[in-house]
Amino acid sequence: MTSHTLTSFGRQISSPVIVALDYDNQDTALAFADKIDPQDCRLKVGKEMFTLHGPQFVKLLHQRGFEVFLDLKFHDIPNTTARAVAAAAEMGVWMVNVHASGGTRMMTAAKEALLPYGHDAPLLIAVTVLTSMEQSDLQGIGIDMTPAQQAERLAKLTQACGLDGVVCSAHEAQQLKKVCGQHFQLVTPGIRPTGSDVGDQRRIMTPEQAVLAGVDYMVIGRPITRAADPAAALRQINQSIAGVINAR
């Protein structure tokens, strides 16, 4: 697991937690952001909030000192995807993603679009299999593989295209680290502290289990954003993760 990264704001963020800002209201999302420390996590902006509020919302988070994962899962023809990824880089986001199922030409074009940004380029990762999907869902779209098999196949393709890592289930993390190496970044949604509502996720793990599986970054939403004390909930998760790391 990545122990820390130096942020564009000159600080170190030791936490692997990315908090999903799954709101439908900008004021509510910013009120949440104002309750937590940018050194304790990063923030994920997804399709709903970005469609509602656009780049200005990302700018407001940057002004508060947060690094942003722009989770728009681009999946289009190579040129369109490349231009979208470059636009994300222009916004100064920390991480952006595409769908690995877009294929080699699309992912390669996206990676090449970031070359002019050098060390300032965001991390570029690809989505393998959505954590809401089970084998029956894959069969329904003509893929005769288990989620783990499909995730491994797409992770290898992603790495061959030069991307930084993948979004995957924590259940696939150990195998993907084995086949893609320790430096290949794994970002996992479907992380729920013990006792949390699993929502619409199907393949989930606790933060502690995710660390032991080799996850680099974990996306956690409602257990933090809907907590009575979000800052305390985030601190508790970070402490539990640190305890596992220190015990290794």
Curated annotation (Swiss-Prot):
Pfam families: OMPdecase
Keyword annotations from UniProtKB, A to Z: Decarboxylase, Lyase, Pyrimidine biosynthesis
Gene Ontology molecular function: any one: orotidine-5'-phosphate decarboxylase activity
Gene Ontology biological process: 'de novo' pyrimidine nucleobase biosynthetic process; 'de novo' UMP biosynthetic process
CDD domains, per the entry: OMP_decarboxylase_like
Residues engaged in binding substrate: 22, 44, 71-80, 131, 192, 201, 221-222
Catalytic residues (UniProt): 73
Record's signal peptide: none
Reactions this protein catalyses: orotidine 5'-phosphate + H(+) = UMP + CO2
GO terms under cellular component: cytosol
Top-level EC class: lyase
Assigned EC number: 4.1.1.23
Pathway per the UniProt entry: Pyrimidine metabolism; UMP biosynthesis via de novo pathway; UMP from orotate: step 2/2
Family from the record: Belongs to the OMP decarboxylase family. Type 1 subfamily.
Its job: Catalyzes the decarboxylation of orotidine 5'-monophosphate (OMP) to uridine 5'-monophosphate (UMP).
Subunit structure: Homodimer.
UniProt-recorded name of the protein: Orotidine 5'-phosphate decarboxylase
The organism of origin for this protein: Photorhabdus laumondii subsp. laumondii (strain DSM 15139 / CIP 105565 / TT01)
Designated gene of the protein: pyrF
